[in-house]
Design a protein with these regions (language model features):
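Short, charged beta-turn/beta-strand-edge "cap" motif at the junction between a beta-strand
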Residues: 25-26, 43, 61-63
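Glycine- and small/acidic-residue-enriched microsegments that form turns, hinges, and capping elements
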Residues: 13-14, 32-35, 69-70
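Short alpha-helix capping/helix-loop boundary micro-motifs
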Residues: 4-5, 40-42
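Short beta-strand segments in beta-sandwich/barrel cores
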Residues: 19, 35-38, 54, 72
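Short acidic-glycine-tyrosine-enriched beta hairpin
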Residues: 10-13, 43-58
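Glycine- and acidic-residue-biased ligand/ion/polar-headgroup-sensing regions
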Residues: 24-36
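C-terminal structural segments of small proteins and small subunits
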Residues: 52-76
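Regulatory nucleotide-sensing modules
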Residues: 9-22
Length: 76
């Protein structure tokens, strides 16, 4: 699957598509459209973001962001 960036600069994820982020501690992930699931390596909690919600990655290592349905996220 290819990654797309929409006109607002958000990364589009198709349903079920997973974004792998390495050593992203301190990065902020914001759901712009759709709902996404986030899990961090060696963390006991997972996070689900609805549109408008943001999450700051707290750990280095692997972070996965997966779209439940078509979604878009911004990264900062």
């Amino acid at each position: 699957m290819k990654l797309e960036i929409n006109n607002a600069g958000a990364l589009r994820l198709a349903r079920g598509q997973t974004l792998k982020m390495l050593d992203a501690a301190g990065s902020t992930i914001c759901a712009r459209e759709g709902t996404v699931w986030i899990t961090e390596e060696n963390s006991r909690k997972d996070v689900v973001l609805s549109p408008g919600a943001c999450y700051r990655v707290g750990k280095s290592g692997l972070t996965l962001v997966q779209a439940f349905a078509d979604a878009s996220v911004s990264l900062a």
